[in-house]
């Protein structure tokens, strides 16, 4: 018994796929627990920085490969070990609502390792002694994904998200063979669209 996002049709396949996504999140939580247990068992838990993040949104109609929040907003968890002083800005249990781009992660890990961020690097450290002022905007783009060419650009601020679609008329049901096999809602949406639903 699940409630998919409102931009999906109310259909058994949609509910099944959404339940599968929620189950995968639970499974990921269990797997992270296994890794943490192994670090403790190996005696290195208090010496290991843990950074967990997603690289793209969910495999869904507005997720992976799209410039919408469901395709860009990804989880990130950072755990600092007991045997090292925490970097400036880090606090265990902190939920951070700053605008952070994944390009900032490389700059941040360099600073946390005591290294300099190269001047041409676009990322901004969000933790540590070299932490910069809060990023005002994060930018994203989409062009060709497999055989699907849909151009989008977006700007995400703390409060608003602007998405510009340069390919009107080409939407979520557009053919993409990779997603056809992995995401059963995609062919369903194309079928419903063809039927005028």
What residue spans do the PLM features occupy?
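Short beta-strand-initiation
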Residues: 61, 148-150
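Active-site-proximal cap/lid insertion segments
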Residues: 1-102, 106, 110-120, 163, ...
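Extracytoplasmic/periplasmic beta-strand context in beta-sandwich domains
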Residues: 74-75, 124, 137, 153
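Substrate-binding cleft/loops of secretory-pathway carbohydrate-active enzymes
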Residues: 62-65, 129-133
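Beta-strand-turn-beta hairpins that frame and shape the catalytic cleft
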Residues: 157-161
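Polar, glycine-rich mid-to-C-terminal structural blocks
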Residues: 124-129, 135-141
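Glycine-rich phosphate/pyrophosphate-binding beta-alpha loops
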Residues: 141-148
């Amino acid at each position: 018994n699940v409630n998919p996002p409102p931009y999906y049709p109310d259909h058994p396949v949609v509910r099944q796929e959404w339940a599968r996504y929620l189950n995968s999140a639970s499974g990921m939580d269990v797997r992270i627990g296994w890794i943490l247990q192994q670090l403790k068992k190996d005696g290195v838990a208090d010496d290991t920085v843990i950074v967990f993040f997603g690289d793209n949104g969910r495999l869904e109609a507005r997720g992976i490969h799209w410039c919408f929040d469901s395709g860009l907003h990804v989880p990130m968890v950072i755990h600092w070990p007991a045997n090292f002083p925490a970097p400036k800005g880090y606090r265990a249990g902190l939920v951070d609502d700053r605008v952070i781009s994944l390009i900032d992660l490389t700059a941040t890990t360099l600073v946390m390792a005591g290294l300099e961020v190269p001047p041409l690097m676009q990322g901004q450290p969000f933790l540590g002694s070299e932490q910069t002022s809060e990023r005002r905007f994060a930018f994203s783009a989409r062009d060709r994904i497999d055989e699907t060419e849909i151009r989008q650009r977006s700007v995400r601020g703390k409060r608003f998200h602007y998405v510009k679609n340069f390919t009107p008329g080409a939407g979520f049901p557009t053919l993409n063979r990779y997603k056809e096999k992995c995401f059963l809602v995609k062919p369903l949406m194309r079928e419903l669209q063809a039927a005028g639903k």
